[in-house]
Design a protein with these regions (language model features):
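Extreme N-terminal leader/targeting segments of oxidoreductases
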Residues: 1-28, 47
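N-terminal Rossmann-like FAD-binding beta1-loop-alpha1 element of flavoenzymes
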Residues: 28-53
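Glycine-rich FAD pyrophosphate-binding loop
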Residues: 47-66
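Central helical "cap/lid" subdomain
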Residues: 62, 194-239, 247-252, 260, ...
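Dinucleotide-binding Rossmann-like beta1-alpha1 core, especially the glycine-rich loop
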Residues: 70-146
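Short beta-strand to alpha-helix junction loop
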Residues: 80, 115-124, 149-169, 288-293
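Helical element adjacent to the flavin cofactor pocket in flavoenzyme catalytic cores
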Residues: 151-184, 194, 198-204
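Flavin-binding catalytic cores
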Residues: 267-308
Length: 308
């Protein structure tokens, strides 16, 4: 007869032994930043045999840029002036769905792209030619207000909550040591053979050779729209215009090329000119914030969207 309990203990001991050997023998890697780039890097490195620790400054992974977005998986429709970007999008989607397919939302969401009748950098004719040249599928749709062309396309969104769960599960599955509420300093590097910095807007804080970037403080309003917009994602192009995407079950998140930006600067670090807005940054959805550009979003949306 087989002693299952004894075999189970042997298996557990073997796993613990492997983990102990891994910690002593394999190179130690520190990944700083718990967004999608950091968690993916940590998982892949641990999978490759490295002994990986991930530091996240906040109390959970995926709370900053990875979770404050339009949640759209771009297939390239958004980039008619860059075929290279389209190809990068198509390749990126394949990789994303291989790694995080369970977070992708298909459902009954309808995706639309529209070319504005004014101030668009691309004409309707050129946009259609671009789609045909790149092999991007589309169906012509009745143009929405203020547009010369509206098409329906086959795109997808991702659920940020599901992505967070899946990222955590993957890291746990390959033995990544996740340390939350950890402010990382250069002194922490001494304990590791390699360091991966994946802190997005804070890249330069831990680097000696700093690079200049353009930083933007951006607002993404979360709103409840009329029922006619339920399960609809709309992007107005190609200029300083509006977009809206479903968020959770009955809400939408808004974007605007111009009005979403509260401040911008080029330099080594981001500069938040309005100090009163600091408490809003990377702090989830804030109900009725005192500082907001929502009225400008509404005015811009009324040009294209009925009952907005």
């Amino acid at each position: 007869s087989v002693n299952l309990e004894k075999n189970r203990k042997k298996t557990l001991n073997a796993v613990k032994l492997c983990e102990a050997v891994k910690k002593e023998v394999y190179p130690k890697v520190l990944v700083v930043g718990g967004g999608i780039f950091g968690t993916t890097s940590a998982t892949m490195l641990s999978n490759a045999g490295y002994n990986v620790t991930l530091h996240e400054e906040l109390d959970s992974i995926m709370k900053c840029a990875s979770n404050i977005n339009q949640y759209r998986l771009h297939k390239g429709y958004h980039y008619p002036r860059s075929k290279e970007t389209v190809n990068e999008c198509l390749d990126g989607i394949k990789q994303f769905k291989r790694k995080y397919g369970d977070s992708v939302v298909n459902g009954d969401i309808n995706h639309f792209y529209a070319i504005s009748s004014r101030d668009s950098l691309v004409s309707s004719e050129d946009y259609i030619k671009f789609l045909d040249d790149m092999g991007l599928e589309y169906n012509l749709h009745e143009p929405i207000n203020g547009t010369d062309l509206t098409i329906e396309v086959d795109e997808e969104l991702f659920d940020s909550d599901k992505l967070t769960i899946q990222s955590s599960y993957k890291m746990k599955g390959v033995g990544v040591n996740v340390v939350l509420n950890k402010h990382t300093t250069k002194e922490d590097f001494d304990d590791y053979d390699y360091v991966v910095i994946a802190t997005y807007s804070k890249l330069n804080e831990l680097l000696d050779n700093k690079k200049q970037y353009q930083y933007e403080v951006v607002e993404k309003p979360v709103v409840r729209l009329p029922d006619s917009y339920k399960n609809k994602s709309v992007v107005v192009m190609d200029g300083p215009f509006m977009c809206l995407d479903p968020y959770k079950s009955d809400l939408h998140v808004l974007g605007h090329v111009k009005h979403a930006i509260h401040s911008t600067n080029v330099g080594d670090y981001p500069m938040v000119l309005n100090k009163d807005i600091v408490g809003y940054l990377n702090n989830g959805v804030i109900s009725n914030p005192k500082i907001t550009k929502i009225q400008r979003f509404i005015e811009a949306g009324m040009e294209f969207f009925e009952d907005f």
